UniProtKB/Swiss-Prot annotation:
GO biological process, one term: cellular response to leucine starvation
Subcellular location: Cytoplasm; Nucleus; Lysosome membrane
Membrane-crossing segments per the record: none
Protein name from the UniProt record: Ras-related GTP-binding protein D
Family matches, as InterPro entries: Gtr1_RagA, P-loop_NTPase, RagC/D
Molecular function as annotated in GO: GDP binding; GTP binding; GTPase activity; GTPase binding; molecular adaptor activity; protein heterodimerization activity
Binding-site positions, GDP: R72, S73, G74, K75, S76, S77, T91, E95, T97, H179, K180, D182, S220, I221
Domain of life, per lineage: Eukaryota
Residues covered by region (Disordered): 1-54
Principal EC category: hydrolase
Function: Guanine nucleotide-binding protein that plays a crucial role in the cellular response to amino acid availability through regulation of the mTORC1 signaling cascade. Forms heterodimeric Rag complexes with RagA/RRAGA or RagB/RRAGB and cycles between an inactive GTP-bound and an active GDP-bound form: RagD/RRAGD is in its active form when GDP-bound RagD/RRAGD forms a complex with GTP-bound RagA/RRAGA (or RagB/RRAGB) and in an inactive form when GTP-bound RagD/RRAGD heterodimerizes with GDP-bound RagA/RRAGA (or RagB/RRAGB).
PANTHER family the record matches: RAS-RELATED GTP BINDING RAG/GTR YEAST, RAS-RELATED GTP-BINDING PROTEIN D
Organism of derivation: Homo sapiens (Human)
Gene name linked to the record: RRAGD
Lineage: Eukaryota, Metazoa, Chordata, Craniata, Vertebrata
Main localization category: cytoplasm
Amino acid sequence: MSQVLGKPQPQDEDDAEEEEEEDELVGLADYGDGPDSSDADPDSGTEEGVLDFSDPFSTEVKPRILLMGLRRSGKSSIQKVVFHKMSPNETLFLESTNKICREDVSNSSFVNFQIWDFPGQIDFFDPTFDYEMIFRGTGALIFVIDSQDDYMEALARLHLTVTRAYKVNTDINFEVFIHKVDGLSDDHKIETQRDIHQRANDDLADAGLEKIHLSFYLTSIYDHSIFEAFSKVVQKLIPQLPTLENLLNIFISNSGIEKAFLFDVVSKIYIATDSTPVDMQTYELCCDMIDVVIDISCIYGLKEDGAGTPYDKESTAIIKLNNTTVLYLKEVTKFLALVCFVREESFERKGLIDYNFHCFRKAIHEVFEVRMKVVKSRKVQNRLQKKKRATPNGTPRVLL
């Protein structure tokens, strides 16, 4: 396997003006024998504030993800491996969580949400515990079950948690991670998932709650299954997901690409992919490619004094596999990357792919520019509402 990393050369001004005038994707039938188009981005003059997704959002518009489960089920290990790049072997030394740990996943990545890690022994249904406040602002509830332990108690706790949460907020996505499956055989994995699925849904049916939908995932921190499961959880919280999938479908159909992922490079969560099925091996190759690009860029991409960033708007990578497949990575935004699977014969039309990528990249920026405007508008409305509450009838409230 050969690896090529590099940054494209700046584009001539005349070429940039021509691309500025044409913003439609070019189909394979329209491809000519002219020179390859450059990788340079004509939109480099766009305001950085629009593209910088590290701006922390208010809690009113940021989804909340709850991590729940019994003690030693692996909740904290999942959080550390996915969002803190901790080695799975190091999680063996993590202490049990004895209080609710809240973390913002927003200042280092495009993916914006809060994670609340609940200790297994806490009774959050205690009368002194405001569980309604917690569930009211929740987008997804992840319940972690240790597949290598007796899970009858976990299923009882799952049923209690889901029924209480559903009464408060019917819009919560309920996700069940059947965790630590790395120690099980393939047959045992399937049997365990079937048994947990059957028992959990039977309990809901007996309680007359057939409307509640539970999603089940087989996960382990020792492979990429936990990243794929978290990707699917986060995707449900992204309102722009149908638009992103549609853009990816248009891009690959016009560029001769077999598969494309839109990755968050910090967490290796893919926030969108095209409509073709996701193969686990394909996803693992994408994750490995991102690691290679970031690691090599950290070594060779920084200045002698350590200044600069290992990943920027000119970042690109090409990895040719020994099965005539090419992996192609391109920067989309500050924390987003597009990873494509292309056949070698299709990659000969690199100019077409790069031009269509420019159109795709511009569309992504426009989608999230609208998103930023909506968020800012909500912030302004919240401030106005607070001011109205603070000054009833035009008289400032005096705090005693």
